Amino acid sequence: MAGIPSTSAPPKSSPTASPNPFAAPRTSPGSVGGQPSYLVPLSVLTTLFFMWGGLTSLNDVLIPHLKGIFALSYARAMAVQLTFFGTYGVMSIPAGSFVKKIGFKKGIIVGLAGAALGCLMFYPAATAQSFWLFMPALFVLATGIVILQVAANPFVAVLGRPETASSRLTLTQAFNSLATWAFPTFIGPIILAVAGLSAAELAKLTPEARHAQEASAVQLPYVGLALALGLLSLIVWRSKLPKIDTDSADGTNSANLLPDRGSAWKYRHLVWGAVGIFMYVGAEVAIGSLLVNYFKEPYILGLAEDKGSKLMAKYWLCAMIGRFVGSLFTLRKFNPGKVLAAHAVIASLLVVTSVLTTGWTAVLTIVAVGLLNSIMFPTIFTLAIDGLGRHTEQGSGILCAAIIGGAAIPFLQGLFADAAGLHISFILPAVCYVYIAWYGLKGHAVDARAKAAS
């Protein structure tokens, strides 16, 4: 999925010009020929986007795995997403203050260390065979990722020419999407394969011993991820990342600057945009969280969990493809609001089609939703902060907090699935997309229309 936007809005990129997105501004100190390259620090930052995208996507593997081990209802299984994305709502504002105090580079290192600690906490949770012990591990992991995102995003926004900032952000988020496909594809089957035991070996185990084997399947992958995060923190520590001043990039250069109303909360297009972020993240996460169980249903494909994990990864692969296409073509050629509305309408229709069908038709239509999700986050974000001027920082914080939709909507769908069935529960994401379509068509322009009429 997409990372949290920086607390300072990137200027819009020109729809016609395509300068090197990695070149620094001409006024940058130490420039050679007016255009030094920030390729090395941007490569390091892109690796961070890749890692937190992958770690987040593994929740979609954990949910069916833990649901099977502990015989959980859908609602209880969604405690994974409730804990993980609930952390965004709790920790985003404190993380921003923390990073502002210690600096962005140190913030990145602390975020990586926190995420590594969270991964290591999976080991004792699995040893104890306690579902609820996984929740503190997820909270610590998510806290590390929140700090990481708050610290890393401003670098991407300012390392290069202002007119190509959105291009850099979208391309960097594409690598985040790449990880959301790669991790479930290559790490997911390791977790879901019951520690590599054959069916004959599993048959010889008592239920208690089998549960122990299943729980231990998460230990090695997450310890490996902790080591990778630790290594990455050392690389960042040794890297010479330039110092940046976000106070000089507050978005006040917007051509559509609106009258100052004293607070970001007084701009309706921002508040409704936050609802859009809530709906988008909630719908995307809810669908991804339940796909493995969905593919397991006999009226869909009846797939085993390890095979379902590989198919689920295609949902995130579609998001990656769509993000590359959107950043390089769609959003450069067409009105962003109309593009957002079209994507949301088609996504809603695809979900409804999946609900009304079975077999491969249901599978292909729900997986294709990932393609439509691809441009929603950056487009909603850009439309929502447009014209806020000096309130852009506050507006960005409001949008970040709205990511808690990734906790609320999946939990509600879990309750719906328990009460009415998994198949019909996907109607909830379809409703979310209807709201996003309205925002793309009408909601984002409400304050601009009021300004024009005054």
What are the residue ranges of the model-derived segments?
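Intracellular juxtamembrane helix-capping segments at the cytosolic ends
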Residues: 147-161, 374-389
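Extracytoplasmic gate region of multi-pass secondary transporters
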Residues: 59-63, 184-192, 263-313
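C-terminal ends and interior cores of transmembrane alpha-helices
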Residues: 113-128, 345-358
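Cytosolic juxtamembrane N-terminal segment immediately preceding the first transmembrane helix
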Residues: 2-48, 52, 262
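Helix-to-loop junctions at the C-terminal end of transmembrane segments
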Residues: 91-104, 322-335, 417
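Central cavity-lining transmembrane alpha-helices of secondary-active solute carriers
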Residues: 79-97, 313-326, 405
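Extracytoplasmic
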Residues: 40-67, 152-153, 287-295
